Amino acid sequence: MRVLLVKTSSLGDVIHTLPALTDAARAIPGIQFDWVVEEGFAEIPAWHPAVARVIPVAIRRWRKNLWQTLRNGEWRRFKQRLKEVDYDLVIDAQGLLKSAWLTRYVGKTPVAGLDRDSAREPLASRFYRRAYPVAWGQHAVERTRQLFAQALDYPLPESVGDYGLDREQLADADPGAPYLVFLHGTTWVTKHWPEAYWRELAERMCERGWSVRLPWGSAAERERAGRLAAGLENAAVLPRLSLAGMAKVLAGARACVAVDTGLGHLAAALDVPTLSLFGPTNPGFTGAYGRSQVHLGSDFPCAPCLKKTCTYQPTEEDRKLFDLKREQPLCFTRLNPQRVATQLEAMLLAPETLR
């Protein structure tokens, strides 16, 4: 059986789809998937054994210069690739208009996706011949697994989802001395753990003899990583890495500390013990999923607010207790460096971490 999967972005969403492929491969021997994914994330699907072909799409880039995209033939070549194989089924696991629109170019193959009450953009369901209900209020991994089980007609496994990645294959053959990875970069301003907290945590762990590695993905993140590592002998700022290079670093780590970020989901997919810190977002819906994953969520009165901009107005008590210039957003004051360090040290002593 050959299935075309449309799940273009984001990094976390792409990773959250992998367990559904593992379920399908175990339920239907010989099934193969071709995966339409944003070019920036195209490395990841190829790591799963059930993926036969990766078809990169560049919606983000094409939108910026639509005329050039049409002239240089990229759009035409992309549509041709969708028609090179006679698929048995197309699954749109994104549930957005942009992903549903791409399914129009496959031909007469039936398209499956979420029904109007289950999709993030209800109008997307109009593009599907087979639309299935999947309840909200559960983790994104489980929602995708349920969609695949219905679309491909197999019993939903009761076990925890398996990403299907080979950590040993992706890891460095000789990672050297044990180290920790601090995943300090993320998108929303409100999802950032305060820089002063990262610095204090780095100091604490370096004092205890741990090496700390700091990746980055933008100029701002590189500068922050430099400030976090400054003067700490055991802290190192990594060079710019591809996703494969980042996977190698994560796969060799003893543990990670992460904010709500796509790389935190990659660490979870590689079964790396990870302590994830959540302020405005809800780990129950989009937290790092898998074994050896610990979520610390803020119990601040307004958390999780799911807002990209903090609207909380500090009280007089807040002004007395916290440095409002260095400790923002305030929901993360409930997850201070001492608490995080204590939890991290407990994680490092756990049997599954001592390997």
UniProtKB/Swiss-Prot annotation:
Its main location: membrane. It is a peripheral membrane protein. It is found in: Cell inner membrane. Pathway: Bacterial outer membrane biogenesis; LPS core biosynthesis. One of its GO terms (molecular function) is ADP-heptose-lipopolysaccharide heptosyltransferase activity. Pfam families: Glyco_transf_9 (PF01075). GO terms for biological process: lipopolysaccharide core region biosynthetic process. InterPro entries: Glyco_trans_9, LipoPS_heptosylTferase-I, LPS_LOS_Heptosyltrfase. One of its GO terms (cellular component) is plasma membrane. Keywords: Cell inner membrane, Cell membrane, Glycosyltransferase, Lipopolysaccharide biosynthesis, Membrane, Transferase. ADP-L-glycero-beta-D-manno-heptose binds at T186, T187, K191, E221, D260, T261, G262, H265. It catalyses: an alpha-Kdo-(2->4)-alpha-Kdo-(2->6)-lipid A + ADP-L-glycero-beta-D-manno-heptose = an L-alpha-D-Hep-(1->5)-[alpha-Kdo-(2->4)]-alpha-Kdo-(2->6)-lipid A + ADP + H(+). Its EC number is 2.4.99.23. It comes from the Bacteria. Belongs to the glycosyltransferase 9 family. Glycosyltransferase involved in the biosynthesis of the core oligosaccharide region of lipopolysaccharide (LPS). Catalyzes the addition of the first heptose unit to one 3-deoxy-D-manno-octulosonic acid (Kdo) residue of the Kdo2-lipid A module. Can complement a S.typhimurium mutant lacking this gene. This is Lipopolysaccharide heptosyltransferase 1. It comes from Pseudomonas aeruginosa (strain ATCC 15692 / DSM 22644 / CIP 104116 / JCM 14847 / LMG 12228 / 1C / PRS 101 / PAO1). The gene is waaC.
